[in-house]
Each structure stands twice: as structure tokens, then as C-alpha cells.
């Protein structure tokens, strides 16, 4: 199953990222002229190929959210709603899309829901990676799976269009997961890579007939450790209103090498704020910070406090003598006096007064 994924790029960044994969990307005008493929007789004329809405990067895309897909017929990026609604739907508001945000590979030729999209409306869903939860008893632990090289990731998808509502929707195809990921989940999205046999076949608009055996052989997921990676992330991804970049950061220290430089910069910034007197002790009550961010800031503040106390102790040892003599008291008074408040005259008076008591106190000590 794939119920959450991340797309860490704005709409303006995506065309170049596809070109980096040597994929052609048409402009809205070019795509519009090619939108009527010979096999799409039932499609509506003048279909929009690029949403008018500007897509912003989101690190927690869930069903019913909009995201980017790449259409092979128009060779354009289009933003559609996640959770496929078939073209024959009479009332979109009553259609339960939670049942259709994934399509099982082995059922594509067995279900009326999937047969037509599989024949004529195939696509690739763009993402930075997807989330999966490992369940042990009542405990669910989220993991993030992405490309090891950090490049844009593609998974096999299908789309449909409801004309009366002018609504494009898509689904993500999943299959039996590879042995290497069975411990995490039994199913996995069908990952595609441009330039491979599976990509070319799935994105071939001239191919409209499939057998289940052919589809399974073509799209069955495998886990190539040299290309894919996974690591544990914060539980905050479970809440759909959380969408920040921190959701895809490794939670465990051994997984965090790729983020170490950024973390050091963030901690240095906190230390600088601490030195300048900016009060960061309110982290605990800051509802905008959760999970790992709170932990990191608390750790930074704790370290700052310890370093500050240690520094003060060292300064005391080097600048203030041990207690006992009158001269010690003089130096302590000099160190503690504020010239702006007391004035230089009062300071000199105190120093002289304490200095005059030195001999008498010294005699008492000798007498004892």
C-alpha cells in the first residue's frame, strides 16, 4: 500500500527535473494541441494539461490532495487529485476515493474500475519518495523510501476524467513487495525508471491490450539497494496537516548523514541566539515545533546551558582569587561593582576602606 508520499519541488522546478531524465516536457500550449490521442475518443476536447493552480512542495501528500503526474500522450505535467474517480461516476461527492488511491497490479485486468484506465490512461506519478508504516502490535513506525541519489522518483499510475465535474484524478499501482522489504510491508508501489524496458512499455500510448501475466512481469517491484534507500522518520507524518521538510529527515542518528551539515547549521544558529540573549526556553510550549525539532532544540539548549556554566566557572577560577584575604575582597568588590551605577568615586572609597583594614586583620591572624 502507498498512502502517503512527498514531492519536494514546486511546479516551476518539475519540468527541468524531467528533462534531467531526458524526458520531453511540453508547454501547456504544445500539450493542448496533442491532447487528443487516437485512442481517446471519449475524452473531452480542450482538456487542460497543466493545472492553473501553482503546486507548492509538500512532504506529506495524502489521498484527495493534488499532485503531479506525467502523461505520455501529451508529454506534459498535469496536477490531478489523488484517488481515482471513474469517468462514469454520476455523483463525485458520493464516490469513496479512499478505496481507489491504490490499484492492485494483479487486478488491473479483472476489475471494471481499472480495465479502461490501464488500456488508455496510464501515467507516471512524480514523487521524492513515499512513506510506509511498520506495524508491530498497536505500534506503527513510519519509514521513508526514496532514491539513494536524491533524484525525482516515478511510480506507475493511471488517471481518469469526469467531464461534467472537469475533474482529473489518479491512482498509484502497487504489487507484492520484494523479499527485502517484507519486514516493512507486504506491498510496494511499482517504481519506474525512465529509459528502462518497463518505463517504455508502460508509457507506450500505442499499446492498449495487456494480460495479467504481462503486467506482473513488467511492473513487479524489486529492491535495488544501490538505487533505493529507507530510514525511519518522525511519527508526525501520521498527521495530514503536517507538511514540512522535517517529515522526511532521518530520525535515527545512523541514518542522518545526508542531513548532518544542515543540522549543524541549525544548531549553530540556536547557539548564536543563546549568546545574544534570545530566549529559546519556550520551545516546550511552542506548538509549531514538534517531534525531532523539539528534541534537537532541547538538546542544543541543554548543551548551551552546560557550556555557559562551565565557561563561567572557568572565568571565576582565573579572574577571582580564593576567598580569605582582604585583597581578595577588594578584587571581588571591583569585579562586582557597576561603574555606571555607583560611580568611580564610590568605587575608590570602598577599595580604600577595605585596604585600610588589612593590617589589623593580619595582626589578629598572627596573634591566633
UniProtKB/Swiss-Prot annotation:
Enumerate composition-biased segments (Basic and acidic residues): 37-46, 281-296, 304-313, 326-349
How the protein is activated or inhibited is described as: Formation and reversal of DNA-protein cross-link depends on DNA context. Catalyzes formation of the thiazolidine linkage in presence of abasic sites in single-stranded DNA. Mediates the reversal of the thiazolidine cross-link in presence of double stranded DNA.
Q: Which GO terms describe its biological process?
A: protein-DNA covalent cross-linking repair; proteolysis
Q: Which residues form the active site?
A: 2 (nucleophile), 132
- Residue ranges of region Disordered? 25-48, 270-368
Q: Which GO terms describe its molecular function?
A: lyase activity; peptidase activity; single-stranded DNA binding
Q: What is its main location?
A: nucleus
**Thiazolidine linkage to a ring-opened DNA abasic site modification sites?**
2
Q: Name one GO cellular component term.
A: cytoplasm
* Compartments reported by the entry: Chromosome
Keywords associated with the record: Chromosome, Covalent protein-DNA linkage, DNA damage, DNA-binding, Hydrolase, Lyase, Phosphoprotein, Protease
Phosphoserine modified-residue sites: 338
Enzyme Commission no: 4.-.-.-, 3.4.-.-
Where along the sequence do coiled-coil regions lie?
none
Q: What superkingdom does the record give? A: Eukaryota
| Family affiliation | Belongs to the SOS response-associated peptidase family.
Functionally, this protein is described as follows: Sensor of abasic sites in single-stranded DNA (ssDNA) required to preserve genome integrity by promoting error-free repair of abasic sites. Recognizes and binds abasic sites in ssDNA at replication forks and chemically modifies the lesion by forming a covalent cross-link with DNA: forms a stable thiazolidine linkage between a ring-opened abasic site and the alpha-amino and sulfhydryl substituents of its N-terminal catalytic cysteine residue.
Q: What is known of its domains?
A: The N-terminal catalytic Cys-2 residue forms a thiazolidine linkage to a ring-opened DNA abasic site. Glu-132 catalyzes reversal of the thiazolidine linkage; self-reversal is favoured by duplex DNA formation.
What protein does this entry describe? Answer: Abasic site processing protein YMR114C
Q: Which organism is it from?
A: Saccharomyces cerevisiae (strain ATCC 204508 / S288c)
